[in-house]
Curated annotation (Swiss-Prot):
GO terms for biological process: adenylate cyclase-activating G protein-coupled receptor signaling pathway; bone mineralization; cell-cell signaling; homeostasis of number of cells within a tissue; intracellular calcium ion homeostasis; magnesium ion homeostasis; negative regulation of apoptotic process in bone marrow cell; negative regulation of gene expression. Residues 51-69 are annotated as: Important for receptor binding. Residues 26-31 form a propeptide. Residues 75-98 are annotated as: Disordered. GO terms for molecular function: hormone activity; parathyroid hormone receptor binding; peptide hormone receptor binding; type 1 parathyroid hormone receptor binding. The keyword DNA damage does not apply. This is Parathyroid hormone. GO terms for cellular component: extracellular space.
Amino acid sequence: MMSAKDTVKVMVVMLAICFLARSDGKPIKKRSVSEIQLMHNLGKHLSSLERVEWLRKKLQDVHNFVALGASIVHRDGGSQRPRKKEDNVLVESHQKSLGEADKAAVDVLIKAKPQ
């Protein structure tokens, strides 16, 4: 059994802990601002690491593609241009004809002249 002095010491220590903790027996529900900021920074850091890892894998795939001796097609002028003149000309069967609704809209625009 504990003596009265030991019991008093334990009670004083428990009272000091409760007084200094100031939780009033309730669980602490709020997080401090610094803890929230730390969690936010950790999330941003993890997403940044994921992006870097994804980019590293893609660059490794490109490097492997070139290392395997795959032929790289070089373009003249860097843009895709039609090779024949006929590719530039619109075929009349593919041209859009004005429907009745389009003609009505054009008539309204012609009649509403700005002053």
